[in-house]
Structure formats: structure tokens, C-alpha cells
């Protein structure tokens, strides 16, 4: 056997021995299962997914990466959608879940079929799945801590929650209530669901305002602050301190209020581009890379001194955003 053939055989043996670590993903298919698209954050999330995955397909990294969104935020509908993706033979399914627990059965089915499942934002509890999230409880707590710094005497708070039943809504709300427990000068006098959408939030707040005492602050989850402000204005009530959620209309309103009367607040949310991180994590796992089952990414916070820059780089009608590259995903997986 020639030295060339011997070297070739050795390299082949090394490649086979490396197994999944040398996996090829160019012929693999990754699908996104999304439970809801009815607000600007979800629209930005889908747009980021489309942008990054189209380039990944064009570059030959994966064969395809389509996104599928259910018509209603229903667990049964999303479960059926995921079952269909299993039958279609996708290699990985990225999930923004309608429930942290109710999809566990179908997620386990996917895992048992050899499919990689990566959940993000609305994560799932099934142990076989991967999870990508921010510290949503902390996101709730820091709003109350900010209120305590601005309103040391405390007061009544109105809480605007997100989409009922979703992990994110429960976690942020739990953090808000933990913050209030540590700052008893505040009292939550009402909680409404705004579904992370300005129009829904405005209607919900308008519905409870007539029965509420004076409100010192409004704690939110994103996509609802501007709607709350409009509801207070329509009711002829003073504008309270409202924490915001990085949407362009909220940031524009904040800038206008700062110019008009010195209004200051803070804004915080998970970047919708986290969907692109989930895509790259799925691709890395398919490529044989070792990735922790639970990954935490920082939330995106905007303060008074970063408002102008953030607004200038946020597309009108969208959300302040960060999109991830493969190198970014590798850094997150490495805990950097």
C-alpha cells in the first residue's frame, strides 16, 4: 500500500472515529415552530429568523429552515404542528412554545425520533430538549427596583402581563411580585393581560382604570407600555412611571415625553433575534458539538443615556434587536 493510500486510510479512520463531531449539516433541515405572531416582538423574531436562515441555506450550511406559526396561541394546535414536523422528517425543531409543560409529550416524541429540539423564549421543561432564555424573573425584579429608586415612598402599581399560559409571562410576573415583596412600600392593585401588544394593553388598561386608585407606576412585560400611556391619557389621568419594553413606538413616545416634560424611565426586553441564536444552537448540535441543555442570554436594557442611540437603530414598528452569528452561539455555549 502506498504511503498516500495509507495516510488516506488513516484519515478516514479518524473521521469515522470522530463520529457526530464531524457531522455534515448541509443536507439537514431545521424547522421553527412558533405559537404566536400577533405583536411587534414576534414579527421581529420571525424576520430575524428568516434573514439569518436564508443566508445559512444560501451558504450551504443547512438545506432549509422554514418557520411555521400557528393561527391561534393554542397548545393543541402547536402540538399537532410539531407532530407534522416530526412526520416530515426534520432533523431539528426550534420551538417558541405556548406552554412550558403541555408540549412535553410531543417534544419527547420528537426526541425519541432522533430529532434535536431547541426551545427559546417560551421554553419547554421536557429534559430531552434544549432551552435558551434570559433571566425573566430578574427582568421583572429590576423594574420594581427601578421604581423603588425613582419612587422611594412607593405607591400603587398596575401590572400588565403578557400572553397567558406562556413561560415568559409567568416568570416575569413572578419576578415583579418578588420585587414588590422586597419593597413593601409598593402595592399591586390590579393585573391585566396585554398580550405584549399595544392595542390589547391599551384596551385592558382602559377597562380597569375607572375602578383604580391613583397609580404611581406601571410594570410591564414589553409591547404594552405605550398602550398603557395612551389609556391613561384618554382617561385624563396623570401619566405614571411606566417601564417599557424596547418597542419603537414606546421608545419614540419616551423621547417625546422627555423633550416635553423631562419624563424619564427605563426599558427592557429579550432581543427578538434570540431566534437566530436558537437556530445556530440547533445547527451546532446537529454538527456534533457539545452544548449545555440550558443557556442563558442577557436581556437588552435601554436607559436614558442609551435611548437616542437605541431609537436610531430600531426599525419603525419593530423592536430594539440583536441578531446572533455562529461564532456568537459558540461563545454563548462556552459560557462566555
Regions found by a protein language model. Name each.
Residues 1-23:
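Gram-negative bacterial Sec-dependent N-terminal signal peptides
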Residues 22-336:
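A residue-level marker of the well-folded mature domains of exported/periplasmic proteins
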Amino acid at each position: 500500500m502506498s504511503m498516500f493510500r495509507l495516510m488516506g486510510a488513516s484519515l478516514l479512520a479518524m473521521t469515522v472515529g470522530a463520529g457526530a463531531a464531524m457531522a455534515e449539516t448541509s443536507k439537514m433541515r431545521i424547522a421553527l415552530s412558533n405559537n404566536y405572531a400577533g405583536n411587534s416582538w414576534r414579527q421581529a423574531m420571525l424576520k430575524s429568523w428568516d434573514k439569518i436562515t436564508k443566508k445559512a441555506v444560501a451558504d450551504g450550511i443547512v438545506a432549509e429552515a422554514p418557520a411555521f406559526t400557528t393561527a391561534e396561541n393554542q397548545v393543541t394546535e402547536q402540538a399537532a404542528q410539531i407532530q407534522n414536523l416530526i412526520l416530515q422528517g426534520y432533523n431539528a425543531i426550534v420551538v417558541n412554545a405556548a406552554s412550558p409543560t403541555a408540549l412535553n409529550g410531543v417534544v419527547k416524541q420528537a426526541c425519541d425520533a432522533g430529532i434535536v429540539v431547541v426551545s427559546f423564549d417560551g421554553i419547554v421543561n421536557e429534559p430531552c430538549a434544549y432551552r435558551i432564555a434570559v433571566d425573566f424573573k430578574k427582568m421583572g425584579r429590576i423594574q420594581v427596583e427601578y421604581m423603588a429608586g425613582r419612587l422611594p415612598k412607593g405607591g400603587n402599581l398596575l401590572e400588565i402581563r403578557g400572553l397567558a399560559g406562556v413561560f415568559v409571562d409567568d416568570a416575569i410576573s413572578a419576578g415583579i411580585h418578588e420585587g414588590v415583596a422586597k419593597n413593601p412600600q409598593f402595592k399591586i392593585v390590579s393585573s391585566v393581560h396585554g398580550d405584549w401588544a399595544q392595542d390589547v394593553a391599551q384596551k385592558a388598561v382602559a377597562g380597569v382604570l375607572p375602578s383604580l386608585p391613583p397609580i404611581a407606576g406601571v410594570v410591564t412585560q414589553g409591547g404594552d407600555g405605550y398602550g398603557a400611556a395612551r389609556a391613561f391619557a384618554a382617561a385624563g389621568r396623570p401619566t405614571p412611571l411606566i417601564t417599557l419594553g424596547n418597542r419603537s413606538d414606546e421608545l419614540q413616545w419616551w423621547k417625546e415625553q422627555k423633550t416635553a416634560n423631562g419624563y424619564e424611565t427605563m426599558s427592557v426586553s429579550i432581543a427578538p433575534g434570540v431566534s437566530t441564536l436558537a437556530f445556530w444552537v440547533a445547527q451546532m448540535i446537529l454538527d456534533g458539538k457539545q452544548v449545555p441543555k440550558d443557556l442563558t442570554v442577557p436581556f437588552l436594557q435601554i436607559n436614558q443615556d442609551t435611548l437616542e442611540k437605541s431609537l436610531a437603530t430600531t426599525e419603525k414598528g419593530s423592536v430594539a434587536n440583536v441578531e446572533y452569528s455562529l461564532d456568537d452561539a459558540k461563545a454563548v455555549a462556552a459560557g462566555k
